[in-house]
Amino acid sequence: MEIAKIIGREILDSRGNPTVEVDVHLACGIIGRAAVPSGASTGENEAIELRDQDKARYCGKGVLKAVKNVNEVIDPALCGMSVLEQTAIDRKLIELDGTKTKSNLGANAMLGVSLAVAKAAAAYLDIPLYRYIGGSNTYVLPVPMMNIINGGSHSDAPIAFQEFMIRPVGACCFREGLRMGAEVFHALKKVLHDRGLSTAVGDEGGFAPALNGTEDAIESILKAVEAAGYVPGKDITIAMDCASSEFFKDGIYDYTKFEGEKGKKRSIDEQVAYLTELVGKYPIDSIEDGMSENDWEGWKKLTVALGDKVQLVGDDLFVTNVEFLRRGIAEKCGNSILIKVNQIGTLTETLNAIEMAHRHGFTSVTSHRSGETEDTTIADIAVATNSGQIKTGSLSRTDRMAKYNQLLRIEEELGPCAVYGYKKV
């Protein structure tokens, strides 16, 4: 079970940008492999991914420095350690880096190693990754939050909000939920096509048409839900990722950044009122980053207004970090945390954030990034932690479907023990 060799390499993600892949070799011959995702809209408090900044290679986005850190710094430090000591290994990685933001080794280097170690350990014990991470009390299949219309930084569509998602909450199992989502996705394609709108897809596999703002996006989705034969609000609900940090400046939520002259400029109170209006008008049950990461007062106001009605998910606000989550719990900001493994940089710290959230009555949503790979680790993490919810894109692009297909396999493996669902706020 000893780690014999750790090898890092540069591969490409779903956007054609370099990322880190790591192989952890055990003395017995077993190998664990993990690839690291990357985000487009990032919270300013996220752990730092190390990029080469060499404009002559990959427009400065190469990761050879991070790979070198894996091969020349991390490998000699971890060789000989037991692969089953995940917490000790992650602690060693944090000590080796020595910075709060993981800017020395790079969060991409550290995460690749951390996840590959877990995969090698699961393979050594001959058990599924979700079982290794979560133990015997692992049985909840997540409700998929499917990003079928992309806006904001994830597309060229003139919509400020970044993601419009469907949640098949009325399904009896994950398999049926996935089918419902796929049928709505195809119905939406026809709705857009019939309007003469583009059906090209964005980074996360959702459509990126030139719609007339937020309400048009939501109403197009509702039309597709009904066309697919489902009841909005009963079978399928709507979730949004506003990514408000992307257009918040000097106390103003400036929609013109993405929507041009037709966009509005809203004060903090007006932003809260607008989101409250949308929730009253449409079957929305989850809002992510409705307020900016730097607008803690706005978050408090939004939680007072909507916290007992919908799930208010902190992504940029919490960045999968117990320090920021602790503040959010104390100040009553939000009621849910988005979990992105590369925001914090190790598996142990990720699990600590999920545990803290659940302990204080928060829900958690396991999430991909806009720059993904064929790696399916987050599917196993979602089941391992019984989070009951996963964000991993739309119903297109293999980098997204890989996670959904892994969840189908896990549900089949769990058999009658599998439960589909999430904790309602």
Swiss-Prot record:
Mg(2+) binds at residues 241, 288, 315. Its main location: cytoplasm. This is Enolase. Keywords: Cytoplasm, Glycolysis, Lyase, Magnesium, Metal-binding, Secreted. It catalyses: (2R)-2-phosphoglycerate = phosphoenolpyruvate + H2O. Its EC number is 4.2.1.11. (2R)-2-phosphoglycerate binds at residues 162, 340, 369-370, 391. Binds a second Mg(2+) ion via substrate during catalysis. It comes from the Bacteria. It comes from Porphyromonas gingivalis (strain ATCC BAA-308 / W83).
